[in-house]
Structure formats: C-alpha cells, structure tokens
Amino acid sequence: MKLIASNKKAYFDYEILETLEAGLALLGSEVKALRQTRVNLKDNFVKIIKGEAFLFGVHISYLDTIHAYYKPNERRERKLLLHKKQLLKWQIEASKERLSIVGLKLYFNQRNRAKIQIALVKGKRLHDKRQSLKEKALNKEILADLKHHFKG
C-alpha cells in the first residue's frame, strides 16, 4: 500500500465510528497526478445521490505537461465504487443518526488501484477537541519523560 494523502483534520474534527475502503472512478490524467501526490483531501465529504456515492471537495491538481486545450476541473465530484449493501447501510445510518461520511486516506493498493478509506463520522464538540489536545500533550510529555529516564 502506497499512501498518497491523508486527511489529518478529520481525525481532529470528527469521532470516527466505522471505516470502509472504496474505489475511485478517475480520469487518466488524475491517476498520473495522484502518482505525483498532487492531491489535497482537506475539506472532502461524501454525498449519496440516487443510490450512488460521490466524493466532493478533493482537489487533484492537473499536471504541468497537460495540453493547453484540456484543463479538467480540479474539484469535480468523483464517483465512489462501493457495494450496494454497504452503501444502503451507511445511507440509513447517516440519515438516522445525523452522521457524515468523509475521506480519510487516499492510497494505491497492491494491484495499483486508487482507493480511498472513507469513514462514518460524528462531529466533535469544542470541549471534545480540547480534551483530545490535552491527551495528546500528556502522551507527548510521558514519552519524553520515559525517553529521558531510560537514556540515563
């Protein structure tokens, strides 16, 4: 698995309930751009429209070597390739419990197919975000103390 991009902000802003791997329907120039890691997953989300899942907000920059007459839309919606059962299950859960679906990681699998790890998430409140920052700082401090203790 070759990691292309990850959405670190999603781990901070959301509580991740369940994850799933989905394929992406891409153009050839977009796959080439992914191989050069010219992608940004920062503010992406998934919408289910007429029984199909689409990924919005992913910015895939086109290559510099592309023809002048061919300028693809860098922020176009991209279709996700999922099984119908998984899609229906997540659609019901998301609508019933007011949950969202976001992309976490974009990568190439062993067969060199572009895949995205999507997650069913629940938004964190401000105090939850503060709590996670405190825990992160505390863990960092503990690791530094342990390192200093064993170093001598």
Curated annotation (Swiss-Prot):
GO CC list: cytosol
Gene Ontology BP term (one): trans-translation
Induction: By growth at pH 5.0 in exponential phase.
Keyword Cytoplasm: yes
Cited Pfam families: SmpB
Family annotation (CDD domains): SmpB
UniProt keyword list: Cytoplasm, RNA-binding, Stress response
GO molecular function, one term: RNA binding
Knockout mutant characteristics: Essential, it cannot be deleted. Depletion experiments show loss of growth after 12 hours, cells remain viable for a further 12 hours before they can no longer be rescued by induction of smpB. Similarly, the gene for tmRNA (ssrA) cannot be deleted; mutations in the tmRNA show that it is the ribosome rescue function and not protein tagging and subsequent degradation that is essential for viability. Mutant tmRNAs that affect protein tagging are however more susceptible to antibiotic stress and less naturally competent for DNA transformation.
Gene3D superfamilies to which the protein is assigned, alphabetical: 2.40.280.10
Classification via PROSITE patterns: SSRP
Compartment annotation: Cytoplasm
PANTHER family in the record: SSRA-BINDING PROTEIN, TMRNA-BINDING COMPONENT OF TRANS-TRANSLATION TAGGING COMPLEX
Family: Belongs to the SmpB family.
NCBIfam families per UniProt: PRK05422.1 (NF003843), smpB (TIGR00086)
Function: Required for rescue of stalled ribosomes mediated by trans-translation. Binds to transfer-messenger RNA (tmRNA), required for stable association of tmRNA with ribosomes. tmRNA and SmpB together mimic tRNA shape, replacing the anticodon stem-loop with SmpB. tmRNA is encoded by the ssrA gene; the 2 termini fold to resemble tRNA(Ala) and it encodes a 'tag peptide', a short internal open reading frame. During trans-translation Ala-aminoacylated tmRNA acts like a tRNA, entering the A-site of stalled ribosomes, displacing the stalled mRNA.
Name the record gives this protein: SsrA-binding protein
Gene: smpB
